[in-house]
Amino acid sequence: SELPNNLIYTRRIPLGVVALITPWNFPLAIPVWKAAAALVCGNTLVFKPASSTPWCAQLLTEILIEAGIPAGVWNVVYGPGGSLGDALVQHRDVAAISFTGSNEIGGRLYSLGAAHNKKVQCEMGGKNAIILLDDADLDLAATATVQGAFYSSGQRCTATSRAVVMR
């Protein structure tokens, strides 16, 4: 930690098979972010990309194979989100699920995961605020607010949805 008297550490504890269920809007970045953490901890993966971005998933898979990822460490399944996502969460060999997508689907996956004693992490479109303090550079803040809200047409889970401004 950059703060004195604070200790921050990470423990790498493999869980086994981790399912990654990812959205269409960042078809390479989000799977790679999720996979990196799971792989570093010693897990194997089952990657279920969005139905609208199978080609990106296929290219990523080919790159990983060419780079030498061991057989069976990176696995991909293609198909409709509802039935396939539910099947992954309920599968006896899947220990954990990481999902990015809608509130509706994330809520259902949480419930299914709890019923099957799974570790479930869902990112379901946070309500992200930009906070402007009295000493803020207003030009910079205005630019950051607009970019945060409208970059990628607002179709990202980290989009700014409100501004909190001091009086």
Predicted regions and their residues:
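N-terminal Rossmann NAD(P)-binding subdomain characteristic of aldehyde/semialdehyde dehydrogenases
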Residues: S1-A35, I69
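Short gly/ser/thr-rich secondary-structure transition/capping motifs
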Residues: S1-N5, Y78-G79, A144-T145
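A structured beta-alpha segment of the ubiquitous adenosine-cofactor-binding alpha/beta core
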Residues: L7-Y9, N75-S98
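Beta-loop-alpha module in the N-terminal Rossmann-like domain of NAD(P)-dependent dehydrogenases
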Residues: V18, N25, P80-A87, G101-R108
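PLP-dependent aminotransferase-like
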Residues: P31-G85
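General beta-strand structural signal in soluble alpha/beta enzymes
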Residues: F47, V76-Y78, F99-G101, V120-E123
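ALDH superfamily catalytic-core signature
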Residues: Q90, A96, E104-R167
